[in-house]
Structure formats: structure tokens, C-alpha cells
């Protein structure tokens, strides 16, 4: 089948849910037996989000092939079976970089390089390249219609219909129908104006996804259809859901996937949404109640920084038929106030990744508390490194143990810069990134959780466990349960005399899905349940 293209745009406000809409539509089309791929186009000039502050951008999602990408790719992978790559996310910066490189090589034969056709053609090439082998390619255009930055992207997707025809392209516009409390009314004017902006560019949306906090009455759908020039059946309300995993079911109930395959002339089987119904049932009505897990981090004021992590913990709850309640604790606050009171009612503690010295001593204090009070502990990336620092200081009595990331003249750097990173000067795209194999020691907590000896997980870091301290740490009870054999790097550490204590250098959250929870999160949440019931 010739690949069909679905372009998803957003209007009125940012963060309107285009990524979730794209991911949910992908899940529905997969349920109909179609091969789906997804792609995110970002209008910013950065080459990728790898060097952007978590407070500005939120989480950086890492693919298996080592791309640092937008967090929406996390939604795509969690909701679908698509294996995404570097091709699945591109930015204005990447496009201009590529076009300028071609111009310097003389590829344009002395022509004047312009936004149209050169920039837009480059964008179209990247979209087509990513779509190879798929029945349907869902392409989300970042930003909001009306932004200057988005114009070249919108022009590129406009040309797709000219190039490929109406039967092979579809425009879905996500918009807002706000409720004005003082007037007691829903308002359609923002949606009308957003569609007007799209039509000025030359794009007539085929389907409108109308976000609202309340049900949209039929007469209002009729009004939107009339003023926006779409069939009333294609005005699809998307009322705020209790949980994001209900969105595919809500969109199916409104027959979004039915309208999409009809407009694209695709014959498919009826969708089987039983797995999604089971997920929603567990999330909304868990059989084993609730566990409370503390996330002790440094970016807690913007929880989007830990998006994949919070979702992976939810998946662990789904696997154990319980709800996971998260308490975000600022590690700097622990440094200022002390640990007392912060973790006393928690069933488990997780210390996530991060960069820089700020807040790290608070993380060490939280780890020591979890170790001494036998509370299940999970350390990821920097969290694993701080667990090694804590163990070296308080169990091995290496008082000045630290990471060379924070103290260059550190007397005992139990965590140090990786050898291949010592000659690196540029920040962007130069970390240890993507999937690497790891061998697990038989009988360890990690081995039991995975039920496998060989695994592969995704990484994003420059610093690693210092092998010079292997002997003293293992002699004092630290278990090195996961090793990257090619370079003899320690990837997983554990403690034996503890209910559940594990640190990993990789990011397991990037591979967890609601329909396939990650083994470590399943095991960790199970330990939290046991801890809760033992209290």
C-alpha cells in the first residue's frame, strides 16, 4: 500500500495535546492492523533539545539509535509499536544545517537558496524518508498555527497534498473550545480564528479535534462545522480525560479512526481495543489500592522533566494492579531542611537522573535514609551514581568520595569522566547516547526482574562508575550486577541486605509502555506494595 500521510497541527494555545492526539491515533490505527510510524517537527533553531534546560523544554527522550528528541516521541513509543529513530524528530536548526551544507558543496549549482523551494523541499525529503515501510505516517507539527517559526513547516505540509493528492494526505487540526466561567458558556471563536489562520496558509483541515473541559453540544458542533468548512462528523470533541490512557478509547468512541481510514480510502479490520480497556480499568479501579513513591530530584518544579519516569511508574502500577501516587521532593529542600519528615510515609524512593552539582547532597541524604530504613530504593543515571557515592562514604568510610563532575580535584572520585569523553569539547550530541547491551549476574535482583542475562537499555551520560574502586566497594557488600562487557563498565549496582535497592546507569523508563511495563518498574512497584503492607 502506498504510504498515507496524516499531518497534525495545533491552534489557539501551546501544549494543547497534539502529541497525545498523534500517539492515540497511532494506537487506534495499529489496532486496525496498520503499520504506523510517527514524526515530530520542531520549529526551534536548536539542532536538538539535548543542550536545552529541562525547565524550558521538559524531558529529553532518547531513542535506541542515540537521538536526543522531543518528549512527544516518548508518547509515540508508549502508545504504539513504532521503533523511532533520529529520523523521527527534526528541527529548523537541522534543516538549515543540512541546506547550508549542500549549498557549500555546490549541490544547488549556483542557484539562490531560498525558503521555498529549498528549505521546504528538505523538510519534505525528511518526512518521506522517515515514512518508508509504513502504511500510515503521522506527522506532528510543533508550535501553534500563527507562529512565525512554524510557517516553513506548514508550507511544506501544504505542498504534500499538491504532490500526493487528497486521498493520500489528511490534515487534523487540534484546537481549543474554552469554557468562560463568568459567562457560563463554551466559545467557538478561538477555533474559528485558528482555522482561518490555517486557511490563509492554504491548508483546509479535514478533521478538527476540539479540546474542551466540558461536553460540546450538537448545536455548537454544527456552528464549528459551518464556520470552519468541515463536515459536522469531522468536528470531534475531546473532553478532558481523567487519565491519558483513556484518550485512545475516547477518540475511538467519537469514531476518529473510522473517519480517518474512510477519508484515506483504507480498508482495515475492526479495531480490538481490549488491551486499552484493561489498562484504563486497572488505572481507574486498582485492585490493590495505592502506593506512595517519592521522586527526589532537582527539576521537580516542572514535572514534565520526568515525563517518561512518571509514566513508567504508572505502568509498574498497572502490572501490579495498584495506583502509584507520586510525591515530588526538591533535593535542595532536603539540603536546607534536613531529611526528617520528607520520606517518613513513603513506600519507596526514586532518585532520577540530572546534571550538575546543585541538589546532589540532598539526593545522597535521601539515599542514605532509604538504605538505613530499608525502604525500596531505585536510582537512575545520576541517582545510581549518588548511590555509589553514598555507599562509599557511609559504608566504606571513604569520607571524601564524590563525583569528578562536581569536584575536579576530588580525592576519591568513585564516579569519574568516561575515557572517551575526555577529548570531547562540544556539548551537543556528544554524550554516551542510545542503546547498549548489558550482562546481568545470575541470581541478582536485576536478573530476577528481567528474567534474562543479556539486556539492552538506553543511556544518556558522560560519567561512569570508577573501576579503581571496585574492590573496596564490593568487599564492603556492594553488588555489581550489570556490566557492559565490551568496555567493562559497571551499569547496575545493588545491595544484598535490603528489601529492594538498585541503581542503574541507563534509563529504563524510555522503554516502558502501558501495554508492556518495564521489568524494573514492575519489580520496584511490587516492592513498594510489600513495604506498604508490612507497615
UniProtKB/Swiss-Prot annotation:
The annotated region (Amidoligase domain) lies at: 1-266
Query: Which terms does the record give in the GO molecular function aspect?
Result: ATP binding; CTP synthase activity; glutaminase activity; identical protein binding; metal ion binding
Question: Which residues hold UTP?
Answer: 14, 187-192, 223
Cellular component, GO annotation: cytosol
GO annotation terms (biological process): 'de novo' CTP biosynthetic process; pyrimidine nucleobase biosynthetic process
Q: Which InterPro entries match?
A: Class_I_gatase-like (IPR029062), CTP_synthase (IPR004468), CTP_synthase_N (IPR017456), GATASE (IPR017926), GATase1_CTP_Synthase (IPR033828), P-loop_NTPase (IPR027417)
Quote the record's binding site residues for CTP.
14, 147-149, 187-192, 223
Catalyzed reactions per annotation? UTP + L-glutamine + ATP + H2O = CTP + L-glutamate + ADP + phosphate + 2 H(+); L-glutamine + H2O = L-glutamate + NH4(+); UTP + NH4(+) + ATP = CTP + ADP + phosphate + 2 H(+)
Disulfide bond sites = none
The record places domain Glutamine amidotransferase type-1 at 292-534
Instruction: Name the PANTHER family for this protein.
Output: CTP SYNTHASE (PTHR11550), CTP SYNTHASE-RELATED (PTHR11550:SF0)
Instruction: Summarize the protein's role.
Output: Catalyzes the ATP-dependent amination of UTP to CTP with either L-glutamine or ammonia as the source of nitrogen. Regulates intracellular CTP levels through interactions with the four ribonucleotide triphosphates.
The miscellaneous comment for this protein is: CTPSs have evolved a hybrid strategy for distinguishing between UTP and CTP. The overlapping regions of the product feedback inhibitory and substrate sites recognize a common feature in both compounds, the triphosphate moiety. To differentiate isosteric substrate and product pyrimidine rings, an additional pocket far from the expected kinase/ligase catalytic site, specifically recognizes the cytosine and ribose portions of the product inhibitor.
Name of the protein this chain belongs to: CTP synthase
Gene name tied to this protein: pyrG
Amino acid at each position: 500500500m502506498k504510504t498515507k500521510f496524516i499531518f497534525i497541527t495545533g491552534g489557539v494555545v501551546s501544549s494543547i495535546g497534539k502529541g497525545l492526539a498523534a500517539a492515540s491515533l497511532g494506537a487506534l490505527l495499529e489496532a486496525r492492523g496498520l503499520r504506523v510510524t510517527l514524526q515530530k517537527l520542531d520549529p526551534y533553531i536548536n539542532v536538538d533539545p539535548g543542550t536545552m534546560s529541562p525547565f524550558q523544554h521538559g524531558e529529553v527522550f532518547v531513542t535506541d539509535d542515540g537521538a536526543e528528541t522531543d518528549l512527544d516521541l516518548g508518547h509515540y513509543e508508549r502508545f504504539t509499536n513504532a521503533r523511532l529513530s533520529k529520523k523521527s524528530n527534526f528541527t529548523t536548526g537541522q534543516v538549515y544545517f543540512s541546506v547550508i551544507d549542500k549549498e557549500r558543496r555546490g549541490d544547488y549549482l549556483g542557484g539562490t537558496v531560498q525558503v521555498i523551494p529549498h528549505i521546504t523541499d528538505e523538510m519534505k525529503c525528511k518526512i518521506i524518508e522517515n515514512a518508508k515501510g509504513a502504511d500510515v505516517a503521522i506527522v506532528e507539527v510543533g508550535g501553534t498555527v500563527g507562529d512565525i517559526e512554524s510557517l516553513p513547516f506548514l508550507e511544506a505540509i501544504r505542498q504534500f497534498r499538491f504532490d500526493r493528492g487528497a486521498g493520500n494526505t489528511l490534515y487534523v487540526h487540534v484546537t481549543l473550545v474554552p469554557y468562560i466561567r463568568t459567562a457560563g458558556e463554551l466559545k467557538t471563536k478561538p477555533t474559528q480564528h485558528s482555522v482561518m489562520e490555517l486557511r490563509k496558509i492554504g491548508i483546509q483541515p479535514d478533521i478538527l479535534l476540539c479540546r474542551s473541559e466540558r461536553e460540546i453540544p450538537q448545536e455548537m458542533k454544527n456552528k464549528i462545522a459551518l464556520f470552519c468548512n468541515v463536515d459536522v462528523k469531522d468536528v470531534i470533541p475531546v473532553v478532558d480525560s481523567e487519565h491519558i490512557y483513556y484518550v485512545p478509547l475516547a477518540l475511538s468512541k467519537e469514531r476518529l479512526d473510522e473517519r480517518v481510514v474512510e477519508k484515506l480510502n483504507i480498508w482495515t479490520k475492526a479495531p480490538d481495543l481490549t488491551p486499552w480497556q484493561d489498562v484504563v480499568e486497572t488505572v481507574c479501579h486498582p485492585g490493590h489500592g495505592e502506593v506512595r513513591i517519592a521522586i527526589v530530584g532537582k527539576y521537580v518544579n516542572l514535572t514534565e522533566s520526568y515525563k517518561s519516569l512518571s509514566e513508567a511508574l504508572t505502568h509498574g502500577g498497572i502490572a501490579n494492579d495498584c495506583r502509584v501516587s507520586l510525591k515530588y521532593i526538591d533535593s535542595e529542600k532536603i539540603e536546607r531542611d534536613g531529611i526528617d519528615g520528607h520520606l517518613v510515609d513513603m513506600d519507596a524512593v526514586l532518585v532520577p537522573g540530572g546534571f550538575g552539582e546543585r541538589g546532589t547532597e540532598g539526593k545522597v541524604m535521601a539515599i542514605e535514609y532509604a538504605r538505613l530504613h530499608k525502604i525500596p530504593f531505585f536510582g537512575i543515571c545520576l541517582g545510581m551514581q549518588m548511590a555509589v557515592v553514598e555507599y562509599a562514604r557511609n559504608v566504606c568510610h571513604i569520607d571524601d568520595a564524590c563525583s569528578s563532575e562536581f569536584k575536579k580535584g576530588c580525592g576519591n572520585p568513585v564516579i569519574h569522566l568516561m575515557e572517551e569523553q575526555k577529548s570531547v569539547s562540544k556539548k551537543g550530541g556528544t554524550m554516551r547516547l542510545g542503546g547498549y547491551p548489558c550482562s546481568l549476574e545470575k541470581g541478582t535482583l536485576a536478573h530476577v526482574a528481567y528474567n534474562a542475562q543479556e539486556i539492552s537499555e538506553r543511556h544518556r551520560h558522560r560519567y561512569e562508575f570508577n573501576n579503581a574502586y571496585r574492590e573496596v566497594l564490593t568487599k564492603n557488600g556492594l553488588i555489581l550486577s550489570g556490566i557492559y562487557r565490551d568496555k567493562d563498565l559497571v551499569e547496575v549496582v545493588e545491595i544484598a541486605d535490603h528489601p529492594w535497592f538498585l541503581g542503574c546507569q541507563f534509563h529504563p523508563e524510555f522503554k516502558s509502555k502501558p501495554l508492556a511495563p518495564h521489568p524494573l518498574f514492575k519489580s520496584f512497584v511490587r516492592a513498594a506494595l510489600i513495604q506498604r503492607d508490612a507497615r
